[in-house]
A protein has these predicted regions:
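Acidic, proline/glycine-rich low-complexity intrinsically disordered segments
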Residues: 2-171
Length: 171
């Protein structure tokens, strides 16, 4: 029994030697395996949390909500490989570039956006970028703030349909 335990520990140690770690002066993003790059999935996309660029910090929940709604809507397209919320939202507020995010997550496309709110007016901008950070598609949606969930669902469906078409046609 001791021999099996020793062999198991030796194998575990050898496997751990191959694991790459982020440098000590650069903490790894939470929920993301720190690595240089992974093989890119075909028809793949990560949805980053949309940025709140209004003067109201309380709008963060709406930004995360619209991002999550879009992610969920994209997941409904079978031909897409959509990176999960935990992995993509780990880059919230980071200064990591799109090319590096794409390489770390193994995706060919990244969707990012912003939300502005002034009074009852809402502007949501979405941008689809390729793995090099080049803009592939963009659209802006202006709405009057009434039913927040209805707005999120409506815009998420529109963005997901357009993004899915762009991602699958570029493969």
């Amino acid at each position: 029994l001791a021999a099996f335990a020793a062999i198991g520990l030796a194998l575990l140690y050898r496997a751990a030697e191959g694991v790459r770690h982020a440098p000590a002066d650069q903490p790894a993003a939470v929920g993301v395996v720190p690595r240089e790059s992974v093989a890119r999935l075909e028809n793949s996309i990560a949805v980053l949390p949309f940025t709140n660029i209004s003067n109201e910090p309380d709008n963060e929940y709406f930004c995360e909500g619209i991002s999550e709604e879009i992610l969920n809507a994209l997941s409904g397209f079978r031909q897409l490989n959509v990176i999960g919320r935990t992995s993509s939202f780990a880059f919230k507020g980071s200064d990591v570039g799109i090319a590096q995010i794409s390489a770390q997550l193994g995706v060919g496309h990244v969707l990012q956006g912003s939300v502005r709110k002034v009074g009852k007016q809402l502007r949501i901008s979405a941008q689809l970028l390729d793995e090099a950070g080049r803009q592939v598609w963009t659209e802006t949606f202006d709405r009057e703030l009434a039913n927040i969930f209805e707005i999120q669902s409506e815009i998420a469906a529109a963005v997901a349909a357009k993004v899915a078409s762009q991602v699958t046609s570029s493969a």
